[in-house]
């Protein structure tokens, strides 16, 4: 996905740095029949600069390897620290296999929690956004059976305040209008299909 996106924006290649194994990128590039060039040192007109982090084992697409769990973490760590240290202006992440990271021995539930921890950020809200719609999540990376217990009045109030402030400051929305979705079918039907709305959502 990353290489295909870059191939469609050739004029912007110099704005990006890929973090990972350069030979892996070259292999993908050849397999996809794209026309990208990669370099470890310089950025030229049609070249993508790569910050080299070597794979432990050659990648087999669709078959995540425990041997490459550390590689995945190292890539994420370099991108995160580089952004915090302002060596990079921003970071773009793709999906990663959480199971092999946890099997490797590193407790990992998702990018959101990882970034909050590494940046020492206590309160964090995940926001999915495009030009038409912005969706904030009240919980992240939890088994479904644990979700309802996490949605409390205190948690919602905290998240809504963060969201309201961010919409004003970063998105320049003067008076944000925030809709809170119900947890149960038909928002609980006044308690007949669940009580989370009457106990938490409506109160907030």
Where are these predicted regions, by residue range?
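Conserved beta-strand scaffold positions in the cores of enzyme catalytic domains, especially
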Residues: 49-50, 124-126, 135
């Amino acid at each position: 996905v990353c290489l295909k996106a870059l191939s469609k924006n050739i004029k912007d290649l110099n704005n990006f740095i890929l973090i990972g194994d350069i030979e892996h990128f070259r292999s993908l590039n050849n397999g996809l029949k794209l026309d990208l060039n990669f370099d470890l040192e310089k950025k030229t007109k049609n070249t993508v600069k790569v910050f080299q982090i070597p794979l432990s084992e050659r990648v087999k697409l669709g078959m995540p390897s425990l041997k490459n769990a550390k590689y995945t973490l190292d890539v994420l760590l370099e991108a995160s620290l580089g952004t915090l240290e302002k060596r990079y202006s921003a970071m773009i992440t793709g999906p990663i296999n959480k199971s092999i990271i946890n099997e490797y021995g590193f407790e990992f539930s998702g990018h959101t929690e990882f970034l909050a921890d590494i940046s020492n950020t206590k309160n964090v809200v995940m926001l999915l956004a495009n030009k038409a719609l912005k969706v904030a999540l009240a919980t992240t990376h939890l088994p479904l059976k644990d979700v309802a217990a996490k949605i409390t009045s205190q948690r919602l109030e905290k998240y809504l305040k963060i969201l309201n402030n961010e919409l004003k400051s970063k998105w320049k929305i003067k008076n944000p209008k925030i809709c809170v979705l119900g947890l149960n079918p038909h928002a609980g039907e006044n308690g007949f299909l669940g009580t989370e709305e009457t106990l938490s959502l409506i109160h907030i």
